[in-house]
């Protein structure tokens, strides 16, 4: 960061008694990098989306990102959150964009603002407001005047806000980059010439807003000048910009993957993520953004998909709750430090590539400022011994070593020296709740319908996304002489729906349910139809589970019951109900009465006592009160005993829950070889999401109102509030582990050997209470499964206990003298340790 920009950013960070001059920062680019005040920069960035956390979390998240070695915070701008109805804007609470950007500025960091306004992001309707679908004549993301007018209006609104607050770097603010559109390349091919015209218009419109900072388009090879095209993906080392005078930028380095209800948790090993980043840098990449760095939570009904979970954890370096995910956070922090040591050669010279073996090579950057080298082993199966500058180096499989002086290794992507945190959800029993219940009214449906229509209506056209729920209600007359009433073959009902979930009621009784999937959100329901003689009420509850967030022609997408709806087995054969008269009710009665709110929950009589647990029927509202647990650990609700529905705390929506069990392949994972989303799966046979984040800032000290709407039926007595804490820490470090401090000292002409060390650290308020495993020698296994190898020092446990028990953090040198002697001379040794963290009394 240039001195002028740094002064401007920090000028807003502290209250001082003198005026701080606004320093205008010039942000430009050339083929090597983004230039800030004329200085080429290697920039590490991380995605943190402001609506996916609370304003009270922003300071801590951004400070941790800065501590992790980031320079930039990247965020989308969420159109449907900011303009829920045409011309009515919301920039409050979690949507206070200006406050978020100023929080980044206060931390002395930059911002990459992705205005879009299409964002994808597994966010409801891709960030578009649903009302946009009903603008006459609209066609999304193509050369269409109604769409372009709306898009330009919102883009101008956001840019105008940023300018009025002096938030662009050209005004002394932190925003150094902006983005228009998002991942248009695949969609643009669908539109042909109209798509090309649209993307040219979008670029010209954005540049014409005169922000004074560069604009970016990601996954758009045809981005017109001066807009920079950038890469998204698990790897981007083969990417090149579309013009030789543009920098090589990676706007989304996927740190993990999103999760869908019914799917497994997708994890990306940090060794592979670090390898991908180092490989990008050695090929000339100079801007890297982790998507996500903190994923956060899809509060309310903001999750897209459909079927995207409420948790947007993304296996990111900072987990859903804002805690460091180790070793991912720490290992990437060391990577950033190592790359920054090479910054001047990297931005000053093109690499010289030298072959070191059949699958090994060196990328060397030489300039007047020094020499830096990246030694790569692309073999995913075996170590490689290579000679570089007449020195011998050992490279683990699928790894890159970084040498800031072309001599000393300070970092290897596959050699993890930081600790691993073992996390737990701890319920202390103090949060047990007394539950009350209120049954959603089904019998009175259609008494006062919103509307009636001949035939079936598309769900969004009726609800306008004001609720997930829409009732389709009709009647069926049955003659008393029907054979099925005299013991004949039972009737059946089939329903075709565009998704996403369907509950079928006949005469107030649940007949069955059906669900789509992300791959095929359409539903084909087939089940018994328990009709009786006379008039029967058929009520279909269609449930949206997040609107799709990716694809083309948003204006044509359908949700809800589309038909046909057919009764089978009558004496007449089949009776098609599709074109009967249908009545519609938007939302639930409980929603209309605001049962989720402090005021509304007092407007009805709630069932109390033992009847609540005994009567686990569908479409039920549950209510309980609880006091806020002590401490400052993040909180979560255990919903594993429930089925499917929504949760509110003090009137604010936690999000959708669904105890759908994960199906997949969880046979294990190794970091080597190209990563793809199905590669490393976890959670098979368990609920995809069991725990739901409860922000502490939403709570009051006592009598917090918890309301749950349950669609299917569940046991509310087992819902519990828990704290997310560190239960233990592990480390596994070689006595020859690369050390950045070694190189820094040696580079100043005083070579000095520094022993590798094991660092253990519990969470604040905790101490190390026990050593479950310790071995100095050749231990086997990984965290949680360590065991002694052929070589083991008998003093291992006692040394670790003496150094660590009773402390929050400890450091243990890896040397024979520290362990009372060398248990196996001439053998490379390691220390593996697993320690227990306990809350201090």
UniProtKB/Swiss-Prot annotation:
Residue ranges occupied by any SUEL-type lectin domain in the UniProt entry: 752-838
Molecular function via GO: beta-galactosidase activity; carbohydrate binding
Positions annotated as glycosylated: 392, 461
Keyword match Hydrolase: yes
Places the protein is found: Secreted, Extracellular space, Apoplast
Catalytic activity: Hydrolysis of terminal non-reducing beta-D-galactose residues in beta-D-galactosides
EC number: 3.2.1.23
Top-level taxon of the source organism: Eukaryota
Keyword terms: Apoplast, Glycoprotein, Glycosidase, Hydrolase, Secreted, Signal
Cleaved signal peptide residues: 1-25
Positions annotated as active site in the UniProt record: 183, 252
CDD domains listed in its UniProt record: Gal_Rha_Lectin_BGal
Name of this chain's protein: Beta-galactosidase 5
Family named by the database record: Belongs to the glycosyl hydrolase 35 family.
Keyword Signal assigned: yes
